[in-house]
Amino acid sequence: MRRTTAQVGALLLATMLAAAAAAATRTDGWATIAGWPDFTTGMWAENYDPKSMPKPVLTAQAQLQLQQKPKAAEGNGARCKPLGMPGMMMPGYPMAFFFTKGALFIMSDMDDLLIRHVFLGRQDHGDPDPAWNGHSIAHWDGATLVVDTVAINPEAPLAGLPSGGHTHIVEHIRLTGPDQLEWRSVVSNPDILAQPWAFTKTYVRHRDWELQEASCVEGNRDEPDATGNAHVDLTPPK
């Protein structure tokens, strides 16, 4: 059917209005992000203080498993496995934040540029597949970002043991100064922890730092044998 000039004009106008509305939505989305606290400039390095880090309180069963664990057993690092959560946030390697509409990406240059994908604005986790860094959703409580993480890979270590897949982490992240970041975490796992493990870390911003490439496998001199065990005896010296 042949359209009239008026019909074609109306169709073009509707298309232009729809495109303008979509562009306005995109612009509004980025304007919203621009109004959030500035986590994204530069990189963050932990202001590490081992004395401020409380030790987790383990269940009796977890204590027994830890005692029976071979002292020479290697950690995930010997086979270049990810540390998972909360391990990714522990070693003190520099991190960077990247916000986009509906998501936050946290990148660490610890090894192979580890990435956490945090979904912003979601109300629930749904039914996610297990992942080394888990499934994270977040919302803003004023100027504090509240992150909730579940579905962590059962092999991800927690207090020296495989977590078993029942770890739940709640984080509160906020700026305490122009170049200071506070990161409060509460880790729960009824199979390993006798009580929630709460700790706070502080980070300092380095505005001129950049993400660096790192590779665990490259240059690795402790490759596993046929059974997957490390060749080097990691038993602590007496």
Give the ranges of each region predicted by the language model.
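Bacterial N-terminal signal peptides that target proteins for export
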Residues: 1-10
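Bacterial N-terminal signal peptides
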Residues: 9-19
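Hydrophobic small-molecule pocket/channel-lining residues, especially in calycin-type beta-barrels
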Residues: 21-238
